[in-house]
Design a protein with these regions (language model features):
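Short beta-strand/loop motif that positions the catalytic acidic residue
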Residues: 181-183, 187-194
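Glycine-rich nucleophile elbow surrounding the catalytic serine of serine-hydrolase chemistry
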Residues: 122-133, 196
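Active-site nucleophile loop of the alpha/beta-hydrolase fold
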Residues: 140, 144-154, 171-175
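Alpha/beta-hydrolase fold nucleophile elbow
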Residues: 113-125
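An N-terminal hydrophobic leader/cap segment in hydrolases
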Residues: 1-24
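Short glycine-enriched nucleophile-adjacent loop
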Residues: 53, 128-143
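Membrane-embedded segments
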Residues: 26-111, 117, 135
Length: 197
């Protein structure tokens, strides 16, 4: 986990002309998650809601391009910082990130009133593993994965082939296994020029 690489905020959706509602979501285990809800647009019904789970380094203020893209496509969006990232409380952990994702889902379906059939779950890099876990336990309209990995042990073994990473890894984020439990349509986006994942 690299939540401390840049916990500072660069900007908000307002800096790119988007209206937003700041969020402070409380997880079942008492952490507070910082986030934003960006409505689809003035007077326009949303085509649905995209819940965005970002990658490892940085925070929600570094993902304004996703908020703009989904807004321009007619979707509302909800983005959170996992525990230990950005302004969220707590300490980063695999299990904690799954609880955080479920907290965002609960807010989307209960407080914002979106039915599951109108929610797209989007995950980038580390967020892809978080999004996959959520989609395996809930039934979103779709799961979109961008530049993600099959599992942390697989990624580690590719980067360090001479080390027994698969045996030593405590953090798993096993998306390959969880994808078999996802019943929603899945779109995987990846670049051949991505030299990290």
């Amino acid at each position: 986990f690299q939540p401390t690489i840049d916990r500072g905020f660069q900007a908000t959706p307002a800096s790119i002309g988007l209206g937003f509602d700041p969020l402070a979501l409380t997880t079942p285990d008492g952490e507070t998650l910082d986030g934003w809800h960006v409505p689809a647009g003035r007077g326009k019904p949303a085509r649905g809601l995209v819940i965005i789970f970002h990658g490892n380094a940085g925070n929600i203020s570094h993902r304004l391009d996703y908020l703009r893209m989904f807004h321009d496509l007619g979707f509302a969006s909800l983005i959170i910082d996992y525990r230990g990232y950005g302004r969220s409380s707590g300490r980063a952990s695999e299990e904690g990130s799954y609880i955080d994702a479920d907290t965002a889902w609960h807010h989307a379906t209960q407080a914002l009133g979106y039915p599951a059939k109108h929610i797209v779950v989007f995950g980038e890099s580390l967020g892809g593993a978080v999004a996959t876990q959520l989609a395996a336990t809930r039934q979103p309209a779709a799961l979109v994965l961008a530049s993600t990995f099959t599992s942390v042990p697989d990624l580690g073994a590719e980067i360090y082939p001479w080390l027994p990473i698969r045996l030593l890894a405590r953090i798993r984020y096993d998306s390959r296994d969880r994808l078999s439990q996802v019943n929603s349509p899945v779109l995987v986006i990846h670049s051949l020029q991505d030299d990290i994942i």
